[in-house]
């Protein structure tokens, strides 16, 4: 998944100081906050983007990793996006909980449990034939899955978590600094609002463990290079009962030996004899589905000419229709080493006739030039 540059999102240079980054974020966060743009999905998405950028660039370690390795370095080596994160947590560090309705939950007991898992990306390479017919692709990857001992709760046995005394179950801590009220995530319960007294020995209280996942993903026919197939709930498991993220399978199509692709159309180059190009005829070629088709070559076909075979290309996504196949003919020059004596004599005779014809045309042409 393509990600925007964090410095560009915050409209700062790569040498910007921490204070400059904070000021830039504050300005943009106020501009795009959902409470100031009700119903504006574009503004909401922009708010999430600048908040994600600030979360990385305001942290010296994450910023160093991002500067060196890009988005992978900022996320600890994994290529995922934390789509389920609560961006208002970071926003509240600047403005407290009184900006608007979307941050009011920080003043009351948390109604949600756990932390949502991250979305994951998996690059899958398939053949053009696979993309033509569609396949069930077996894939495997390693991620955090739900702990089967505690069933994702993080607690050992039937003992339930208790309310955090530090934040009184809100998951947030407020501190007064002059005229400003600063609100931050509770460092005792890490924003959960509750404490696990008897942690699961298998997962250490996180509710998840590291393991390999094996699944089969349906790749539809007609899929194009770079397309993403979303597998709901197959991303990283949420912590302590949180919602699992999604898996995005990014399709890469291997280069084909014969065909090139442009959307649903296919293109190929086919060499033909000089005599066939002159006299016309038919050639047999094999289409992407393995079937043989006859392609008519008109008389006098020149090298580079494209012959169209309707509905012999790739299928359109979610449709029974197909694109076209374009056959570009390449007229081969005869090699005298591969010709018989009779063939050479016939070519010489043809050349003599052609030479006389060309001379007559040349004389007529230059005669017109002289008259002018």
Curated annotation (Swiss-Prot):
GO cellular component terms attached to this protein's record: cytoplasm
Annotated J domain residues: 5-70
Renumbered ranges of CXXCXGXG motif repeats: 147-154, 164-171, 186-193, 200-207
Keyword Transport found: no
Descriptive protein name: Chaperone protein DnaJ
Cellular location(s): Cytoplasm
Zinc finger (CR-type): 134-212
Gene that produces this protein: dnaJ
Complex and partners: Homodimer.
Binding site for Zn(2+) 1: 147, 150, 200, 203
Lineage, highest ranks first: Bacteria, Pseudomonadati, Pseudomonadota, Alphaproteobacteria, Rickettsiales
Pfam families (alphabetical): DnaJ (PF00226), DnaJ_C (PF01556), DnaJ_CXXCXGXG (PF00684)
Cofactor, free-text remark: Binds 2 Zn(2+) ions per monomer.
Free-text comment on this protein's domains from its UniProt entry: The J domain is necessary and sufficient to stimulate DnaK ATPase activity. Zinc center 1 plays an important role in the autonomous, DnaK-independent chaperone activity of DnaJ. Zinc center 2 is essential for interaction with DnaK and for DnaJ activity.
Transport is among the record's keywords: no
Matches recorded under CDD domains: DnaJ, DnaJ_C, DnaJ_zf
Its job: Participates actively in the response to hyperosmotic and heat shock by preventing the aggregation of stress-denatured proteins and by disaggregating proteins, also in an autonomous, DnaK-independent fashion. Unfolded proteins bind initially to DnaJ; upon interaction with the DnaJ-bound protein, DnaK hydrolyzes its bound ATP, resulting in the formation of a stable complex. GrpE releases ADP from DnaK; ATP binding to DnaK triggers the release of the substrate protein, thus completing the reaction cycle.
